[in-house]
Structure formats: structure tokens, C-alpha cells
């Protein structure tokens, strides 16, 4: 694609706002909001950290082509849980909790709504390209919007619009105005004074609608994952021929991305690790896991225990009970090693018979 002339980009990203309006209209008819509204609320919970709900909307188009691709990604606490891809023209639920809460029916409705959006998008993208009068090439409209629930109960929202990978507009919640990112012509500024979306509607979505649906999601997620049972803690002990002993504490079936594992010696903390969203590991079934290890002198194992603090749970596991688990793991490893050593012999016999 040829380099641009360097002139300020004259386009109307308000077109993308029309797309978002189709996606984020009131919960009765909305695909995304309808999905969140369908999740049943079984009580509320006290927030222990900041939670986020984020929508990424991207529209791709080749100038001169009627083909337009729409990709909608929805994240909760930075985890992707719903995706619509214009190539497959289907909505895909991500995460076991969705499949357990009518995910298939939800996806069918999502797909039907987003197909209609994609049809409208073709004409909208053509309008943007014509207004820009740029040279041929791939162009992208993108939007990032959503909200945060803070641990103190307050909320804040965000809404950014961009074109070809660069931010163009940002909504300011304090002044309830749209600000143009980067240099812009007076013509562009005047255009937004006339055509920008109504600030009161944007404010309602960021302040009320988005946080309410995020609250519903968090409540449903918590209740759904608690059905899998309480968290579990195991302690293993690995002995080495010479040197120290490694004790490893593992926590499973965690239903949020926050936990604290503490090693205690004779009941007193000696090592503590707090896991947050960026350090805890997903288990692949909608729950999370974490582990922490400590090295001790041989014979000190009975002095140590591991404590998990997770939500309302506090679980203690002693190091002595981990020997059995480690022994069984060693047996399994030995069996695997034996099978592996026998494999070349089996292959040799099979090849000899084949010849």
C-alpha cells in the first residue's frame, strides 16, 4: 500500500458508533447485553478487587470490495468468553460456565443478530472509504469500550474509537465530551460537535448498563463454579539423594483469579505468595490453580504445613501427607520410564516381522 500524503485523516468514525449502537442497544434486543441479562443472579458478593467488562469491536474492509469482516470479542477480567467471527458467521462461547448456562441458545441468538449487523456494516464501511478517499488497501475501524467495578464499590468506564490501528476519539466521563486524539483539523472538530453520539446515552451505558451486567456475570460465575466443589490443596515432597527437600503446595478448583498460599513452620508463616490475575494459571475448565514451593532440610517436613486462603475458604494441609502423593507420582513415572525403554524393542520386533 502506498504511503499516505501525511494529511490529517478525514473520515467519520461515527459510522462505527452506529455499529456499536446495534450491538449495545437496550438489553431486550441486544446480542451482547441480552446475553449478559440472561444470566441469572443468585445474590451479590463483596468485591475484593477490580473487575472489568471489555468489548473489542473491529471491522475490516478492502477498498473496492464488498467484503467486510466483523470481529467482536468480549472479555471479563481480561479473559475472552464470547467471540463472533465474520468468517464463520457464528458466535462462539468460551468457558465451561457459559455452556452450562444456555450457551448454545445464546450463541444462536447472537449469531442471528450479528449477521444483521454485518449486512449493515458493508454499506457503512463503503461510506467511510468514500469519505476518506484514500488509496486502495486494507482499512480497519476499531472500538474498545467497557467498564470497571472497583473494590470500593465505585465504577468507571472507557470508550475509545480508532481507525487503522490509531486512536481517534476518547470519551471523557468527567466532562461528558468526546476528545480528538492527536492533531485534527477544525473541520473534524466541527463535525463532531454536530454528529458525535449523545453524551447522556454514552454516560448511561458506561455508568449503569455495563456495570449492572458485569455484576450479574460475576454473581453467576461465582455460583456456577462453586457447584464444582470447594478448593483443593495437595502437598508433595521430593527427596534428593544429597541436599535439601522440596515441598510443593498446589491449590486447585479456584473459582476466581485471586488466592494466597502460605507455608508455615510450626504454625508461623515463613513464605507467602499472593496470586493475582496476571500470575494465577487457568485449569482449562473455568477454574484456576496455583502452586508454591519451599526447600527444607531433610527431617524437617513434619514442621511444615501449607495454608490456602481463597474467598471464604481457609484450607490447611501438612507436608507429611504429601509423601503418599509423591510416592504414587514416582511409581507412575517409573512405569512410564519402563514403558518408554521397552518401546524401541517392540518397534524392532515389529519391523523385523514386517520384513
Swiss-Prot record:
Pro-sequence residue ranges: 331-355
Region (Alpha-2): 138-229
Bilayer topology annotation: Lipid-anchor; GPI-anchor
Entry keywords, A to Z: Cell membrane, Disulfide bond, Glycoprotein, GPI-anchor, Lipoprotein, Membrane, Signal
Superkingdom of source: Eukaryota
Gene3D superfamilies reported in the protein's UniProt record: Immunoglobulins, MHC class I-like antigen recognition-like
Pfam families: C1-set (PF07654), MHC_I (PF00129)
Tissue: Ubiquitously expressed in neonatal and adult tissues.
PANTHER family: MHC CLASS I-LIKE PROTEIN MILL2, MHC CLASS I-RELATED
Protein family according to the UniProt entry: Belongs to the MHC class I family.
Protein name: MHC class I-like protein MILL2
Protein encoded by which gene: Mill2
Amino acid at each position: 500500500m502506498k504511503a499516505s500524503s501525511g494529511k490529517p485523516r478525514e473520515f467519520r468514525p461515527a459510522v462505527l458508533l452506529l455499529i456499536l449502537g446495534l450491538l449495545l442497544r437496550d438489553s431486550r434486543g441486544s446480542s451482547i447485553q441480552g446475553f449478559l441479562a440472561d444470566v441469572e443472579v443468585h445474590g451479590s458478593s463483596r468485591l475484593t478487587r477490580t473487575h472489568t467488562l471489555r468489548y473489542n469491536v473491529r471491522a475490516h474492509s478492502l477498498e473496492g470490495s464488498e467484503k467486510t469482516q466483523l470481529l467482536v470479542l468480549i472479555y471479563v477480567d481480561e479473559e475472552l468468553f464470547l467471540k463472533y467471527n465474520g468468517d464463520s458467521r457464528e458466535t462462539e462461547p468460551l468457558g465451561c460456565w457459559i455452556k452450562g448456562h444456555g450457551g448454545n441458545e445464546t450463541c444462536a441468538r447472537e449469531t442471528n443478530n450479528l449477521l444483521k449487523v454485518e449486512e449493515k456494516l458493508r454499506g457503512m464501511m463503503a461510506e467511510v472509504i468514500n469519505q476518506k478517499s484514500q488509496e486502495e488497501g486494507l482499512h480497519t475501524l476499531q472500538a474498545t469500550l467497557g467498564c470497571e467495578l472497583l473494590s470500593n464499590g465505585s465504577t468507571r468506564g472507557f470508550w475509545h474509537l480508532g481507525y487503522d490501528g490509531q486512536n481517534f476519539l476518547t470519551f471523557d466521563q468527567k466532562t461528558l465530551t468526546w476528545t480528538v486524539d492527536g492533531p485534527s483539523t477544525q473541520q473534524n472538530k466541527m463535525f463532531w460537535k454536530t454528529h458525535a453520539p449523545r453524551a447522556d446515552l454514552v454516560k448511561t451505558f458506561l455508568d449503569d448498563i455495563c456495570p449492572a451486567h458485569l455484576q450479574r456475570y460475576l454473581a453467576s460465575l461465582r455460583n456456577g463454579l462453586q457447584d464444582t466443589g470447594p478448593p483443593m490443596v495437595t502437598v508433595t515432597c521430593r527427596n534428593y539423594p544429597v541436599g535439601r527437600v522440596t515441598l510443593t503446595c498446589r491449590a486447585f478448583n479456584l473459582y476466581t483469579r485471586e488466592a494466597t498460599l502460605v507455608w508455615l513452620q510450626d504454625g508461623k508463616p515463613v513464605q507467602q505468595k499472593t496470586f493475582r490475575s496476571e500470575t494465577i494459571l487457568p485449569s482449562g475448565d473455568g477454574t484456576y490453580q496455583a502452586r508454591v514451593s519451599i526447600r527444607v532440610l531433610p527431617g524437617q517436613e513434619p514442621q511444615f504445613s501449607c495454608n490456602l486462603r481463597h474467598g471464604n475458604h481457609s484450607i490447611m494441609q501438612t507436608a507429611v501427607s504429601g509423601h503418599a502423593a509423591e510416592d504414587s507420582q514416582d511409581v507412575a513415572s517409573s512405569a512410564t520410564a519402563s514403558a518408554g525403554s521397552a518401546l524401541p524393542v517392540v518397534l524392532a520386533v515389529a519391523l523385523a516381522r514386517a520384513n
